[in-house]
Amino acid sequence: MEEKVFDCTVETGDWRYSAAIVGLIKYFDFLYQKGVADKSELYEFEDDYLRYNSNYISEENYLLFVEKYFKDAMHHKVVENILLKDELSEDEIVLINDKLKANQAMKSIFGKIKYTGENKEEILDLIEKNRLKLIKETYRRGKSLYSNFANENLLFSDNNKVCRLVNYCADMGKKGKSLGYYWDNNTFKFKDEKIFDFIPFAFSKSYDAFFINNNVSIKELKKSNSFIENSENTRTTLFGNMKESAEYIGFDVEVILKSRDKNYYETVYVREKAINIFKQSDDFDYKGIKFWYRDDEKNPKYMEPEIVN
C-alpha cells in the first residue's frame, strides 16, 4: 500500500493561517469532487493543524476553483451558461453583450464582438481557449475578489519582500527604508506565504466580508465559517451563529472584517461575556440593517456599523 505524502503542515493561530487552512480545505474538496484524488491523498487535519500534499496545488487548478467558487463574478462563465441554453430571451441577449465588455479582460479577448444569434460557437470557442486568462485577470483585479484581500500583483508570487495581504504590504521602492529601524530596511520583519492566496475563500462573500477565527479546532473553524459563506446579510447570520455556538465557546472569539471600501482588515473581538448573554437569550433575534438611504438611493450610506457598534 502506497504511503500518503503530506509534505506541508499549517497550524492555526494567527488568523491569516487559520483562514488559509479554511481556504485550502475548500480547494482540496473541489479537487476531490472533480475526481482528481481521494481526500485521504489530498489532506488530513487534527484539532490545530492541517497536513496536505502540495503537489496537488497548481495555478490551473487554483483558477478553475476560483471559476467555480466565485462563479457569479466570472463574466465569461455567465456568458457561457447562457449560450449553452437552447433558447435565449431578449434580456439574456442584452446581458451577454454587456458581459462581453464588462471588464478589461473581456474586452481584450472579445474586442468589438457582439452576440448576433449566429456567432454562438465563435464566442464559446474564445472562452474555452482563453478561460484561464479570463479567470485570472477577472479574479486578481476584482474589487470583490482577490484585490479586496491582497495586492493584485502578488497573486501566485513567491519570495516576496513584503506580505501580499492589503495593509500588510508596502511599496518597497518608495517606502522600504522608512519601514526599518533607523532607516535600515534589514531590520524590517514581515511574514508572507504562498498559502495566503487561499485566504479569500475563507471569508464570506458579502460586501463586508467576515472570517470567524474560532480556532478551538479546525472542525469548528470550518463549521463557523460555513454558516456565513453565502449569507446575504452576514451580520444577522454571524450573530445567530454566535448564539448557536455559545454552548461550546468558552472564550473570546476573534472576527476579522474586510470591507470593500477600506484598504485594511479590521478585528472585532466577541467577548465571552457577550457570548454568555447570547446563551441565556431564548428569543434573541438580531436583524442586520443592510442599507439606510438618505436622499440619493444611488449613493446609499452604509449605516449598520454606525448604529450597532
Go through each PLM region and give its residues:
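Intrinsically disordered, low-complexity regulatory regions
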Residues: E229-N309
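Short, flexible coil/linker elements and helix-boundary hinge sites characteristic
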Residues: G35, K85-E87, R131, N215, ...
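Alpha-helical protein-protein interaction elements
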Residues: D7-T9, N61, N160, S231, ...
